[in-house]
């Protein structure tokens, strides 16, 4: 078998392994627990003319989350579970709990088109197939909320909490599920339910609540659910949706809260040789691209798995042993094992190592190579990381400095700048969280200096004071107030995914995608804006400026300039030959068509026709 000397230090396999590891670390399993009691089927708001219910709101939110998940988080797994139902469907045979699913799919699995399509229409058949009832009533020891938590925990048994994030999300508008009970029965059922939730949390499961307030009263977290999910003090307020009369506002709030911000990876941050803390990294705003193409089997329609095999050059047989790599040194072949190669390519024992501090004004705009990464501390593995992180963050903010660090990524080690960000809050909540931005810095050979362009004062036109004044007035008239890049979706991507969604769900009509990047014609048609535009045009081009005439004149001048350039080039090329001598000796027929046309172009003669016609035209012009 042949060894691989040139690919000794290639990172192909390492890069693939990193992608798999990062994907597994980002994988999430979610169980949606939906309250199906009769209260969920009452009108959601007082001013609701369509009589839409909280149940309808939840179905819309989960459907939207599933569609988004297929696009951006296709490896996540989801289960949908109703509690307070007449029918039961779960492996534990517990009453009042119904695990919803479709054929050819596991209860906890990646979402598919059939699940989304059938779940979005579940309201039509819910009462007849599943049914709604009050699960916790006086005179009964049945506890459907306890049963639902038990079933959800059982669904989330697969996968390790070290590599998979597991969540239980509860949707309900009942803030006191045990309000109809009294005495020791109520106390005992509350205690066992809270204990069941804490047992699940001890196993690494996260329990979240998305409460919905009824028209007649706000959702009161302190009655029960604050103890269930472990909230205290000001944390309770963050869980309450802001009050609003429109169901659309409530739906938008739920959609935002269902999409949890997830870490990209966990890094070890070495402050000194003896002090190391743990931090999580989060991706910020960056360009979105269409999903990668997945090759499918033509018969089963299942994704294909790519496999790579090595073949011996001598025998043509498959090589079963792992590939070996070597380096020729002093006319000797030095073989490397996989572990030795890994040690050679490891440039740092820590993911992130602090080098020192510099003033913030040393950092320039062009030092930012690509979108930054946000860093936040974690005490999950290294206790006390948050305390050290806060001390470092506060000192950097107070002294106006940034930290210079070495990011020991195996495939591309880089110098990074760590810039502390202060928390920004408003009456509506937190706008920007406290933390540190990791800016990727260039090496010296990455910096490109622009070429100097020498211009005289006559080369570049200068605006007059009147033109600057009119331009400033125009900018004030069309100012975009409260602008944010988050308000605009990429129309090409929206149409791309809209078509895929329509095809997957079997919809007859393609979605109508609104292009929010187009100019606001209604806003630009306002009289004050039109007046500002006309005044600016008049100050630059004059009162009697006609755009069509100007464009026609510019096109004519451009064409004339182009013709002159072609004629000059042809004249220069034809001057290299003695055409009179060529005509006398009969060698014109030996010239190429390009050379013949250069003579004709230089003298303003037609260049059409075959070679014989071109030669005849030249002879006529020469008077031969």
Curated annotation (Swiss-Prot):
Catalytic activity annotated for this protein?
ATP + H2O = ADP + phosphate + H(+)
Q: Which Gene3D superfamilies match?
A: 1.10.1600.10, 2.40.290.10, Ku70, bridge and pillars, SAP domain, von Willebrand factor, type A domain
- The record's EC number reads 3.6.4.12
Q: What InterPro entries does the record point to?
A: Ku70, Ku70/Ku80_beta-barrel_dom, Ku70_bridge/pillars_dom_sf, KU70_core_dom, Ku_C, Ku_N, SAP_dom, SAP_dom_sf
Expression by tissue, per the entry, reads:
Expressed ubiquitously.
Q: What happens when the gene is disrupted?
A: Severe developmental defects in both vegetative and reproductive organs resulting in sterile flowers. Hypersensitivity to methylmethane sulfonate (MMS). Longer telomeres.
Q: Where in the cell is it found?
A: Nucleus
The UniProt keywords, alphabetically, are:
ATP-binding, DNA damage, DNA recombination, DNA repair, DNA-binding, Helicase, Hydrolase, Nucleotide-binding, Nucleus
* GO molecular function terms listed in the Swiss-Prot or TrEMBL record: ATP binding; ATP hydrolysis activity; damaged DNA binding; DNA helicase activity; double-stranded DNA binding; telomeric DNA binding
User: Which superkingdom heads the taxonomic lineage of this protein's source?
Assistant: Eukaryota
Q: Which PROSITE patterns match?
A: SAP
A Pfam family it matches: Ku
Give the GO terms filed under biological process for this record: DNA recombination; DNA repair; double-strand break repair via nonhomologous end joining; response to heat; telomere maintenance
Residue intervals of the Ku domain: 270-470
Which SUPFAM superfamilies does the record match to this protein?
SAP domain (SSF68906), SPOC domain-like (SSF100939), vWA-like (SSF53300)
Q: Which CDD domains match?
A: KU70, vWA_ku
- Please describe the quaternary structure of this protein: Interacts with KU80.
Q: What is known of its domains?
A: The N-terminal domain (1-265) is necessary for binding to KU80.
Q: What does this protein do?
A: Single-stranded DNA-dependent ATP-dependent helicase. Involved in DNA non-homologous end joining (NHEJ) required for double-strand break repair. When associated with KU70, binds to double-stranded telomeric and non-telomeric DNA sequences, but not to single-stranded DNA. Required for the maintenance of chromosome stability and normal developmental growth. Plays a role in maintaining telomere length. Acts as a negative regulator in telomere homeostasis.
The UniProt entry, under NCBIfam families, shows: ku70
* Similarity remark: Belongs to the ku70 family.
Kindly provide the name given to this protein in its UniProt entry: ATP-dependent DNA helicase 2 subunit KU70
- Name its species: Oryza sativa subsp. japonica (Rice)
Task: Name the gene for this chain.
Answer: KU70
């Amino acid at each position: 078998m042949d060894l691989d000397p040139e690919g000794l230090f290639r990172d192909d396999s390492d890069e693939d392994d990193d992608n798999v590891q990062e994907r597994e670390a980002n994988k999430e399993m979610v169980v949606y627990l939906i309250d199906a009691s009769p209260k969920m089927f009452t009108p959601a708001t007082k001013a609701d003319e369509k009589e839409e219910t909280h149940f309808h709101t939840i179905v819309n939110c989960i459907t939207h989350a599933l569609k988004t998940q297929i696009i951006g988080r296709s490896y996540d797994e989801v289960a949908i579970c109703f509690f307070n139902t007449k029918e039961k469907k779960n492996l534990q045979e517990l009453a009042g709990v119904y695990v919803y699913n479709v054929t050819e799919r596991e209860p906890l699995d990646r979402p598919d088109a059939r699940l989304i399509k059938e779940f979005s229409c579940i309201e039509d058949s819910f009462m007849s197939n599943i049914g709604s009832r009050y699960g916790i009533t006086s005179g009964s020891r049945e506890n459907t909320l306890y049963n639902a938590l038990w079933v959800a925990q059982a669904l989330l048994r697969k996968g390790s909490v070290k590599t998979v994030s597991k969540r239980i999300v509860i949707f309900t508008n009942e803030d006191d599920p045990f309000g109809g009970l009294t005495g020791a029965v109520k106390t005992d059922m509350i205690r066992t339910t809270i204990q069941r939730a804490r047992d699940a949390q001890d196993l690494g499961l996260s329990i979240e609540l998305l409460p919905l307030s009824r028209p007649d009263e706000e959702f009161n977290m302190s009655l029960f659910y604050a103890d269930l999910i472990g909230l205290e003090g000001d944390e309770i307020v963050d869980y309450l949706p802001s009050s609003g009369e429109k169901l659309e506002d409530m739906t938008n709030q739920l959609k935002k809260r269902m999409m949890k911000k997830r870490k990209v990876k966990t890094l070890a941050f070495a402050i000194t040789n003896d002090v190391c803390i743990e931090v999580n990294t989060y991706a910020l705003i960056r360009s979105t691209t269409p999903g990668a193409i997945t090759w499918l089997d033509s018969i089963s329609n299942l994704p294909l798995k790519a496999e790579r095999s090595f073949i011996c050059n001598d025998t043509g047989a498959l090589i079963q042993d792992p590939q070996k790599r070597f380096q020729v040194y002093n006319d000797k072949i030095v073989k490397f094992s996989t572990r030795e190669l890994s040690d050679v390519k490891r440039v740092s024992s820590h993911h992130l190592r602090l080098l020192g501090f510099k003033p913030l004004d040393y950092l320039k705009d062009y030092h930012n190579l690509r979108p930054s990464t946000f860093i936040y501390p974690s005490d999950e593995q290294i206790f006390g990381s948050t305390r050290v992180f806060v001390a470092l963050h506060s000192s950097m903010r107070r002294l106006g400095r940034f930290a210079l660090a070495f990011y020991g990524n195996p495939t591309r080690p880089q110098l990074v700048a760590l810039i502390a960000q202060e928390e920004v809050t408003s009456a509506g909540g937190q706008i920007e969280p406290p933390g540190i931005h990791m800016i990727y810095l260039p090496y010296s050979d990455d910096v490109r200096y622009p070429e100097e362009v020498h211009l005289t004062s006559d080369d570049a036109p200068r605006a007059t004071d009147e033109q600057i004044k009119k331009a400033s007035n125009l900018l004030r008239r069309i100012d975009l107030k409260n602008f944010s890049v988050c308000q605009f979706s990429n129309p090409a991507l929206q149409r791309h995914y809209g078509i895929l969604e329509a095809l997957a769900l079997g919809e007859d009509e393609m979605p109508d995608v609104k292009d929010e990047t187009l100019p606001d014609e209604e806003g630009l048609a306002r009289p004050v804006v039109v007046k500002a535009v006309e005044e600016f045009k008049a100050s630059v081009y004059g009162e009697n400026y006609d755009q069509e005439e100007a464009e026609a004149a510019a096109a004519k001048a451009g064409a004339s300039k182009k013709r002159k350039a072609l004629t000059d080039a042809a004249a220069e090329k034809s001057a290299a030959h003695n055409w009179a001598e060529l005509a006398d000796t009969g060698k014109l027929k030996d010239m190429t068509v390009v050379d013949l046309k250069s003579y004709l172009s230089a003298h303003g003669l037609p260049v059409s026709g075959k070679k014989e016609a071109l030669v005849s035209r030249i002879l006529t012009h020469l008077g031969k």
